[in-house]
Design a protein with these regions (language model features):
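Positively charged n-region of N-terminal signal peptides that target proteins for export
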Residues: 1-5
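Bacterial N-terminal signal peptides
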Residues: 7-18
Length: 166
C-alpha cells in the first residue's frame, strides 16, 4: 500500500508539475533529452522530484503507455513504473523482454480512472539489462483487444539513468 501511494504521488506530481511549479514561485523545471528517454526534474526550496521517462506513442499521436524510473528518498532503490490504459486484464502479468531475452513479469499495483500502473523496485540485474539492451518489448492483455505487444527503444536509457542517479 505504501508503494502504491508513493507511486501515485510521484506520477501525479510529475504529470501536474507545471501547475505545481506555478504554485511555488521558486520552483524550477528541468527537462533534458537523452535520445528516446527524457529526464524531468521539478525542484523547489522545499523538495526535488526527478524521473526519467519514455512514452509509447500510438499511430494517431496519443500516448499508449509510459515507462518511468524515480529515485526516492526512502533508500529502497529506484522505483520503476509502467502506466497503461484501463481495460487491461489485471490477472495477466505485464511481460518484459530485452533484445528477445525474457526479463521480468510484473503484476499491476493499482488503477485509477485514467490508467493502470505497475510499480516495482526492480533488482540491479533488471536495470543492467536495460542499460545493455537496445529494445524492450512489453506484452500485456487488453480485455477488449487481447494481447498487445509494443516495442520500446532503450536508446539513451543508460545516460538518462546516470543523470537520474546524479
Amino acid at each position: 500500500m505504501k508503494l502504491m501511494r508513493l507511486s501515485f504521488t510521484l506520477f501525479a506530481a510529475l504529470v501536474f508539475s507545471t501547475v505545481h511549479a506555478q504554485s511555488q514561485p521558486d520552483a524550477k523545471i528541468t527537462s533534458e533529452s537523452y535520445k528516446d528517454w527524457t529526464y524531468n526534474c521539478l525542484a523547489s526550496s522545499v523538495e526535488e522530484q526527478c524521473e526519467i521517462v519514455t512514452k509509447v506513442v500510438t499511430n494517431d499521436g496519443g500516448t499508449f503507455a509510459q515507462l518511468s524510473f524515480q529515485i526516492t528518498k526512502d533508500g529502497q532503490g529506484p522505483l520503476f513504473q509502467i502506466a497503461v490504459p484501463t481495460l487491461v486484464d489485471l490477472k495477466k502479468f505485464v511481460d518484459l523482454e530485452v533484445d528477445k531475452t525474457p526479463l521480468a513479469k510484473f503484476g499491476y499495483s493499482f488503477c485509477n480512472r485514467q490508467a493502470c500502473f505497475v510499480a516495482e523496485r526492480p533488482a540491479v540485474e533488471f536495470i543492467d539489462a536495460l542499460k545493455r539492451g537496445n529494445e524492450l518489448v512489453m506484452t500485456l492483455r487488453s480485455v477488449v483487444n487481447g494481447d498487445i505487444t509494443t516495442k520500446i527503444s532503450l536508446l539513451g536509457f543508460t545516460d538518462a539513468f546516470a543523470r537520474l542517479e546524479g
